[in-house]
Structure formats: C-alpha cells, structure tokens
Design a protein with these regions (language model features):
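N-terminal accessory regions of nucleic-acid-interacting proteins
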Residues: 1-6
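Short hydrophobic beta-strand that contains or immediately precedes a catalytic carboxylate
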Residues: 9-11, 259
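Short acidic, Gly/Ser-rich segments with clustered Asp/Glu that frequently serve as metal-coordination loops
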Residues: 13-20
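Metal-dependent phosphoesterase core characteristic of DEDDh/y 3'-5' exonuclease domains
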Residues: 22-25, 31-32, 37-63, 88-198, ...
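Metal-dependent phosphoesterase signature
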Residues: 63-80, 87
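Acidic catalytic cores of enzymes that act on phosphate-bearing nucleotides/polynucleotides
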Residues: 195, 206-286
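Long, charge-rich C-terminal accessory regions
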Residues: 249-425
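C-terminal non-catalytic accessory extensions
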Residues: 421-473
Length: 473
C-alpha cells in the first residue's frame, strides 16, 4: 500500500433513483487514512438544478432537500463535477461509499459524462481504486458475523440499511439521508468491521481490484468459490457457493458462474435456447409454470464483487444461512461430468439482450468509450470561455459529443445559443418535461394523501409543486 494511501468516503443525495436520467442534489465526502481516521476537511456541495428536469417528489420526501434549496446553495453542474473530480483524482485514493458501486459511482459517471470528464479514469489512474462498504458488510454477516450487532427487518431477515446498522451498533447517525451524516456513518461502520474482523477486511480490501479477483477464478477446474451479493437474497444471507464455468463471450470483465444450490439437472438437460428464455423471465412467472430458476449469474470482476475460496464459508455459518454444503458438492460433481456445459452457458450469453434504444444522448454513456483524441478535445472544451463554445474549432470522432455539447451550452450558457438553437432547445425541453409531467403530478397527489397529517412533508410537497408548476408553465 502506498504511503500516501487514503480513502475518500462519499455519498450523493439525488432527485431520483436512476443515475442515467436523474440529477444529483447534494454531494458529501471526507478523506480518511487507511484506518478510517479523518485527515481532510469535509466537502459538502449542492448542485444547481436545470430547467429541463422535474425532480421525483418521492426523493424529496426521503432527503428533505428541495430543488429551491439546491438552486439557492448550489453551484452549476460543471463546477460541481470539477470539484468532485479534484477530490477523487488525488493519487492513491480509494473512493468508497455505501452501495456506491451500483448507485453513487453511476451517478458520478453520468455527471462526469455530461460535463466532458472521463467517467472512469478517477477510479484507476494514479494508483486509484474504488470499493463498496455495503458488500463488505454483507460478507461480514455471512462469513464472519462475530463482533457486530446485526439488524433485522419485521420478517426476521437481516437488514443492511445503514441507519438500522448504526442504531444497532450505537453509532450516532442523526439525519439519515443527509449526505454528510451518511458519510460519517459509513466511516464508523468501516472502522468497526476493520476492528472486529481485521482478516476479513484485509482479504476483501486486497481483492477489490479485478487483477486480484481474477487470480481466484479457475474455470477449467470449476473451483468453487463463496460469493456474496445483494442479488442473491437476504433469506440466505446473500451468500452462495458458486462454480465458475466460463468467461463471458463478449464482456471480458464478466465470468459466468453457477449457483451450486440451484437446479443443476435442469441446467444440464435443457437446451441453451430454453434456458436463455427462462433466465430472462420473472421468477414469479416461472413459479406459476412450475419451472425452477436458471442457476446462472454473471459476476463482474470490475465491480468489486465479493468472491473468496469456498472454505471461507465455515460449516457453522453454512448451517446458519441454510446452505447445504453436501448438496452443493454433489451438484459440482454433476457439472464437472457434463461435457457440454461450458459451450451451453457461452451460447446462452452469446446473444445480447435487446434493450429499447435511447433517444437521449445523456443516457448513452455505455454506448462506447471515447478515443484519446476526443478525451483531449473534451478537456479543452471544459476550459473554454462560454463565448468560445459555439465556435470551438475542434473535431470529434464520437457522434455523441456535439449533442452533449449542445445540451451543455443550453443548460449552463444559454446566451451562447443562436436563435435556431434556442428554438431547438425549447422544443427538446418542453417535450422532456411533458413526458415526465403526468408521473410528477400523480406522485404529488399520492404523497399528499399519504402525508395528509404531516405538516413538514406537506410543506416540502408544496415547494416541489411550486417548482414543477413554474417549469411547466
């Protein structure tokens, strides 16, 4: 570990649940040393909202942050993104949050993408990395639960909600869903796990990057591994034994694994075509037809997955989680005897799933990587004064960039648009707002009924209503 290594623990609050289409409201972050002692000044930022976006009223009910507050306290998104980049890109920084791999990191990527910042470099360049405390907490519960007070929901299932865990462990966490409060709570939980289960912490810290994870995976021998993931269900502690079968045919960062507690006989006997159809069918529909789920899963080695040698799941913890180790070993033997299983699973994943094509360039982050030439020119764009953006004289290879630039200018430098561009933007803006208006109004009505006896929530809803009405007028 580098002598200047540090964690940067962070959290977003936002105006919706979709990082591709929803906007950030608040960012908070704190730098710590390797033992989670705070070594930097807290960073708290609000992001000004743009006039082509309606916030989800549900989000305001959770966070208590209104768009008016963001516009009063906030900075424009290009500046907001640049300040975050400055923190994230300090050398030997490990960026970490609580569910950041699936949410906050995606919010970062899309925010950077809209503002001509490379969406990925911050997490690997200059010795940098990322990690997610949520999956480490899940792994601790499943594999080494001693020393932590665990929280449970009303059904007796383990709950990994940060506010429940902090309460169970006597960690101060007022104002849950305020970004800075959540950052302090994340730091305290990380420190607790490192103190109570140092070996577990160290193993998964070392194995957070894809190079180290790759060393654990042996598809030739189908060497079993223990895997912990929120996709696997709280009823079994989000934990299974898996056998790695093959690398994904088109995504070099994904390995196809088999859940060894699943229906292996079906996997072996059914055709790839039928299995593929079942794989993308809702579990409830399969149950109605009396069909078992396909026990296949993709593990993405670039998303800090929790993988460890099978023996890490001790017999007593397997029993506690309801995992039948002998049944899993019997299934592993069946897989190893199946001559065509690898070819079959590769065939299942060879055909890409079809998704609705997007008509919004801002949701097309994953449509390809930018070339080095485009990245260099985007860096120039970010530094240009507003009046030079219209006639920048730069050439771009990627067709997304001119449209992104148009949106960027329209949102943040509207006066740089000519008359034709202003008309184009107003049409785009009107269409986008109208598409979300019905859902916005339905949410306001439903929440007003739900919180009819809560003056604080009703006041927030009134502010959101007024904000939306002004945009839609």
């Amino acid at each position: 570990m580098a002598t200047d290594f540090s964690f940067f623990i962070y959290d977003y609050e936002s105006f919706g649940t979709n990082p591709a289409s929803d906007l950030p409201a608040q960012f908070a972050g704190i730098r710590t040393d390797a033992d989670f002692n705070i070594i930097g000044e807290p960073v708290m930022l609000y992001c000004k909202q743009t006039n082509d976006y309606l916030p989800a009223p549900e989000a305001v009910m959770v966070t208590g942050i209104t768009p008016q507050e963001c516009n009063e306290k906030g900075i424009p998104e290009p500046e907001f993104a640049a300040k975050i980049l400055a923190e994230f890109s300090q050398p030997n920084t490990c960026v970490m949050g609580y569910n950041n791999i699936r949410y906050d990191d995606e919010m970062t990527r899309y925010t950077f993408y809209r503002n001509f910042i490379d969406p990925y470099e911050y997490s690997w360049k200059n010795g940098n990395s990322r990690w997610d405390l949520l999956d480490l907490v899940r792994a601790c519960y499943a594999l080494r639960p001693e020393g932590i007070n665990w929280a449970y929901d009303d059904d007796g299932m383990p709950s990994f909600r940060l506010e429940k865990l902090t309460k169970a462990n006597g960690i101060e966490h007022e104002n849950a869903h305020d970004a800075m409060a959540d950052v302090y709570a994340t730091i305290a939980m990380a420190k607790l796990i490192k103190e109570k289960q140092p070996k577990l912490f160290q193993f998964f810290f070392v194995h957070r990057g894809k190079k180290e994870i790759e060393k654990l995976i042996d598809t030739a021998e189908m060497t079993p591994l223990v895997h912990v993931s929120g996709m696997l269900g709280n009823y079994r502690g989000n934990c299974v034994w898996v056998a790695p079968l093959a690398w994904h045919p088109t995504n070099q960062n994904a390995v196809i694994v088999c859940d060894l507690s699943g229906d292996i006989d079906n996997l072996i006997s059914k055709s790839a075509v039928d299995l593929r159809q079942d794989l993308y069918t809702k579990k409830s529909e399969l149950e109605e037809r009396g069909v078992s789920s396909v026990p296949l899963k993709l593990v993405h080695i670039n998303k800090c997955p929790i993988l460890a040698p099978a023996k890490t799941l001790l017999p007593e913890n397997a029993a506690r989680l309801g995992i039948d180790r002998q049944h899993c070993l019997d299934n592993l033997a069946k897989l190893r005897q199946s001559l065509d299983i690898r070819e079959k699973v590769i065939e299942i994943f060879s055909e890409e799933r079809e998704f609705e094509p997007s008509d919004n360039v801002e949701t097309e982050l994953y449509n390809g990587f930018f070339s080095n030439a485009d990245k260099n020119n985007m860096a120039i764009l970010r530094d240009l004064p507003a009046e030079k953006l219209a006639e920048h004289g730069l050439t771009f290879e990627d067709k997304r960039i001119p449209e992104l630039l148009f949106h960027y200018r329209a949102r943040h430098f509207y006066k740089t648009l000519n008359r034709a561009e202003q008309i184009k933007w107003q049409k785009y803006r009107q269409r986008k707002l109208e598409q979300s208006a019905v859902k916005f109004e339905e949410s306001l009505q439903r929440l007003a009924e739900e919180y009819s006896d809560n003056p604080t929530k009703l006041n927030l809803l009134q502010q959101v209503y007024e904000y939306g009405a002004k945009l839609l007028s």
